[in-house]
Structure formats: structure tokens, C-alpha cells
């Protein structure tokens, strides 16, 4: 569930227990105190809005198990900085530097970075609205929760992007000390990769560019990912369809759905109830 705060910014609770109680609190700080001893993450949400009007207040950030990560992207937009792609377009205003991720890093805070959809219409994971990536040894509930707690997370805006980043064998989110630096990086996306930046203290340490055109060694088997788009229709009208996709002289090894949820987040005028429509 979610709590709004003009003073501290909006926050979202993610509970381990499915029957966790709804906590009554007077402020976000009171909420954090009452959450101690419980398996719950309290995460700052759409952080880049104006301070004092639902934007994040970094003075209330508490490093630790309650808030191991913060939300950099959702369907509200991108809070990495007050510039760049995916601006905030909601009626709560444009982005403000003092609530952004880069501002929090400049203060010396340690936190993981994630994204989430904020899909009010019952479509968690809606394509293009933000998603979290977790590096865990297995897909069990305990393994995923521990990976979240230890900040082994990353953020993606739409496609699933696998990021395996290590510094002297430490994973994303770990804290290490050393006199030398050895970086390992492996990135796999659902489309061609334009570039990868390694950023340190607000400065680009290295940039790796992908090829402008696909590269396939002569005589090698062609391996590729193909994105299929279909539609379109008026956003308020639903269309029931069934489709089939096949390939000649080849094999389809996997399919990654890119289904989007409803194009709105609030009840529509004149509607007293909303029915979730399922893509599969």
C-alpha cells in the first residue's frame, strides 16, 4: 500500500507476509519506527516532484533494511536527475533537482535503485511503466527478498535488461574497500544496445558503444530478437483477439511479452466500477 506525505514525499510498503496489517501512522518517520522488527520495505516513490508537494525529502532517508532501495522510474517519469529522458508529466508538476537520485548520491547516501509501474488499474509489470531487476540465486520468495534487502537490484524502463556488474567480485549493492579496482560487466537486452556508461561520483568513467548494425560472423547461425508490434485502437475501447506467430526455416526459443496495461490510472468519469482485462 502507499502513503502520501507533503513533508517527506510519497512512500510505498512492500510486505513479506501476505496478511501483514495496515499500519496506522502519523508520518512517514512514525511509519518507519513502527515497521522495525517486521519484514517490510518502505520505498520512496516518484521522488523527483517538488519538495513540500509529494516530492522526496532526502533529510528523512534512513539507510538500512527498511529502505534498502529507492524508486528511480515509474509511469510518472524518471527521477535520475531534473533533466534527461522521461520527464514528469503528471499534474503534481515538473521535476526538481533536490528530490532526484543524483542529488541523493551527492549527499553520500547508499541505496539500491529500482523501478516500478505504479499501475493503479491492476496491471503490475505493465510494459513501459518500469520494472525491477533482482539478482538472486533462485526464484524462491526468501531468495528474492534477501536480494532486495542486500540491494542486489536494478531498474529498467520497459524491456528486461540483465545487468551483471561486479567490482572486485562484489555485486551491485555491496559495499567494499580496496586499493585496486577490477570491473566485470555483462549486459543483455531485448534489442540492440546503444551504449553502456559506467558513472563514478557524477562523472562518466567509461562508455561502451554497441554496433550500429547487427554483427553475424560469416557461416555462423543467425541469432536474433524480433519485436512484433500490433494494434492499434482507441485507448478506451477493448478488442478481443487471438493470434499466432511462426517462423520458417528456423526456431523460436523464447517469447517475451510486452503487454501494456490500461492507459489511465484513475477511475473514468461516469464509471462506477472497473474490470481488469487480461493479456496472455
PLM segments and residue spans:
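Extended, charged catalytic domains and RNA/DNA-binding interfaces, predominantly
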Residues: 1-280
